[in-house]
């Protein structure tokens, strides 16, 4: 927060001119760097690194030093910092979409070496080598983002698996295990996109509206705005969780949606794996998701290709149709291998009109998957036609 306020003051006081930290650095960085290095135990080493950085890359290095978390400023390996700046600037110079990025977008959404609070890895050069060939023929940000998103599973060899070692894995940790949580997968995608000059950021919610769990995903910036996507690409602004995101609660941290920012915002990103931490800067984006979800629902219904489908779980077949016999259960919905939705069914104390309902494309075969009372995976498969449909499952 202090450095954020310093920036506002310094922009007014030092609108032009050079920095005493070296040529290529605007003067308004001086008070920011002064504040960042004032109590840093290796300030001299960082100043030396800044002097040794090529002039064309020096502002990028200064920007990172100005906003780095104190822990990184004190301990992050300087060769990692140097490599990160070198490859980020190389990508900006090489790719046509990166050349036209506003400085503010490049600095905060391409340059940073971390997506959230993961271990700091030397991923930038490795990912540049992996993904630069994927975008060699692309001409726009959207084309390049889609090319990376479609190829990432094959190029990093990581799959979703709850047996992963920890939630917030770094790229190297995930690739070593060949598995990651949604958090680890999102870190991989953010870094892969950034490696070739594509603005990307980590997004998530501590819990959905029904408290059935947290989720993380990725946003990509193109055409002047943010678009959501996931590690397993199904299209931009298309995801199984959109209906849930549309029910997120504005201003309620436990059920809101946040995006990570490297630069301070005056707010923080809630880390479900480290609930007491305030170390990651964030910005709430709940309202945008609510508005997008509502507009998407109206569009799907107006198009006539989708129909409402409700799913209810009862204790036994004899309980069907009773309020008291309903069971709250987490449900995932698939069309073939693709997840198209998810939610939590209504329990016995909820209003009869309150239940798990989603829009599904007509003339499709869908599977509702949940765990029964014995902890066994249970599936109910139905054919969805032209009319609204109610589907039931049983715990016993």
Provide a role label for each language-model segment.
Residues 13, 148, 178-203, 218:
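Cysteine-centered nucleophilic/redox motifs
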Residues 20-33:
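Mature N-terminal, pre-catalytic/accessory segment of carbohydrate-active enzymes
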Residues 161-162, 195, 206-211, 216, ...:
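His-Asp-centered catalytic microenvironments across diverse enzyme cores
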Residues 4-13:
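Sec-dependent N-terminal signal peptides
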Residues 44-177:
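Secondary-structure boundary elements
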Residues 371-396:
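Structured interaction patches on ligand/partner-binding surfaces of diverse proteins
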């Amino acid at each position: 927060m202090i450095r954020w306020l310093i920036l506002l003051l310094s922009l007014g006081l030092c609108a032009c001119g050079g920095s005493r930290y070296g040529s290529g650095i605007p003067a308004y960085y001086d008070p920011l760097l002064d504040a960042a290095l004032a109590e840093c135990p290796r300030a001299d080493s960082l100043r030396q690194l800044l002097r040794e950085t090529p002039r064309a890359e020096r502002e990028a290095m200064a920007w990172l030093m100005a906003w780095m978390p104190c822990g990184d400023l004190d301990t992050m390996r300087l060769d990692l910092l140097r490599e990160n700046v070198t490859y980020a600037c190389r990508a900006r110079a090489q790719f046509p979409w990166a050349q036209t990025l506003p400085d503010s977008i490049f600095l905060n959404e391409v340059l940073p070496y971390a997506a959230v609070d993961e271990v700091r890895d030397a991923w930038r050069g490795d990912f540049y080598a992996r993904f630069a060939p994927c975008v060699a023929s692309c001409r726009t940000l959207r084309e390049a983002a889609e090319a990376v998103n479609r190829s990432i599973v094959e190029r990093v060899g990581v799959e979703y698996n709850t047996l992963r070692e920890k939630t917030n894995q770094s790229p190297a940790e995930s690739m070593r295990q060949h598995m990651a949580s949604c958090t680890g997968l999102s870190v991989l995608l953010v870094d892969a996109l950034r490696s070739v000059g594509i603005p990307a950021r980590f997004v998530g919610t501590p819990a959905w509206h029904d408290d059935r769990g947290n989720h993380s995903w990725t946003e990509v910036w193109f055409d002047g705005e943010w678009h959501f996507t996931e590690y397993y690409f199904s299209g931009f602004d298309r995801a199984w969780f959109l209906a849930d995101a549309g029910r997120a609660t504005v201003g309620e941290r436990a059920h809101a949606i946040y995006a990570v920012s490297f630069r301070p915002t005056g707010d923080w990103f809630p880390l479900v794996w480290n609930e007491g931490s305030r170390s990651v800067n964030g910005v709430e984006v709940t309202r945008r998701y609510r508005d997008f979800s509502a507009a998407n629902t109206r569009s799907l219904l107006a198009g006539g290709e989708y129909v409402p489908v409700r799913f209810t779980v009862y204790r036994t077949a004899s309980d069907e149709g009773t309020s008291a016999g309903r069971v709250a259960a987490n449900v995932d919905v698939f069309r073939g291998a693709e997840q198209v939705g998810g939610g939590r069914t209504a329990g016995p104390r909820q209003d009869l009109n309150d239940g798990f309902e989603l829009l599904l494309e007509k003339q499709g075969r869908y599977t509702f998957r949940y765990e029964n009372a014995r902890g066994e995976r249970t599936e109910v498969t139905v054919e969805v036609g032209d009319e609204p449909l109610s589907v039931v499952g049983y715990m016993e």
